[in-house]
Design a protein with these regions (language model features):
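Bacterial N-terminal signal peptides
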Residues: 6-16
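Short beta-strands within extracellular/lumenal beta-sheet-rich domains
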Residues: 36-48, 89-96
Length: 218
């Protein structure tokens, strides 16, 4: 019996250490998003009966993200390079309550997928976003109902290329292809958005365990 309790305590401790938990959110991406230096856009609209006092989001990506709520930038350059272990992923915890409102809320996320490794980054090999938002009154998770598409304005620049130690690519931005107002448009489908592809759930390969990032964001 004592051995059972020791194993149980160890399992709970390990789960806490690795950030293992059940979430509504699933790993999602556009169906054609798996090339190095890919920029992806995601949209989800929700209706809230009132503004929550607290609404904590767990957000994990490969590799970086920017988050807007109702057109207001809530997270600038979120996420860090993968590598809590050779196979696992970090996630951010952010209270989004200050950005939410009664009624309609528009969630928009831009994700930058490095798609290659460096001395400080372990690529999962698959572009992806996992988003989970929890409040006392509701839970919202990323799934196939989210709309997404690759951002057409971003591309890779010509040589010279970054040093092989870096996973980032040089960026080319063609303003002629920009999707102005994609964060708040009432009909993302008119900009080419379509339903996301579900890649897996929390803890599944290739992203594996998600570990909480022990940093505070402004």
């Amino acid at each position: 019996m004592n051995r059972f309790f020791i194993v149980l305590i160890f399992a709970f401790s390990l789960s806490s250490l690795l950030g293992i938990q059940a979430t509504e959110g699933k790993w999602i991406a556009p169906s054609d998003a798996n090339h190095p230096n890919t920029w992806m856009t995601f949209r989800k609209d929700i209706i809230l009966p009132k503004r929550p006092e607290k609404a904590v989001a767990q957000i994990a990506v490969d590799s970086k993200y920017w988050l807007w709520i109702n057109g207001q930038l809530a997270v600038f350059e979120g996420g860090v390079k993968r590598g809590p272990t050779p196979k696992d992923t970090y996630y951010d915890e952010v209270d989004l309550a200050p950005f939410l409102q009664k009624g309609k809320n528009q969630i928009a996320i831009l994700v930058w997928y490095f798609g290659k490794e460096g001395f400080s980054h372990k690529s999962s090999g698959q572009a992806g976003l996992l988003f989970n938002l929890e409040s006392r009154k509701f839970v919202l998770g990323s799934d196939e109902t989210w709309l997404c598409r690759i951002h057409p304005a971003y591309g890779s620049a010509d040589a010279p290329y970054p040093n092989f130690r870096l996973p980032e690519s040089n960026i080319r931005f063609d303003a002629r292809k920009d999707m102005t107002g994609w964060q708040t448009t009432e009909c993302p489908e008119t900009l080419g958005f379509s339903n996301a592809l579900v890649l897996g759930t929390w803890g599944e390969a290739p992203y594996n365990y998600c570990c909480p990032l022990k940093l505070k964001r402004a």
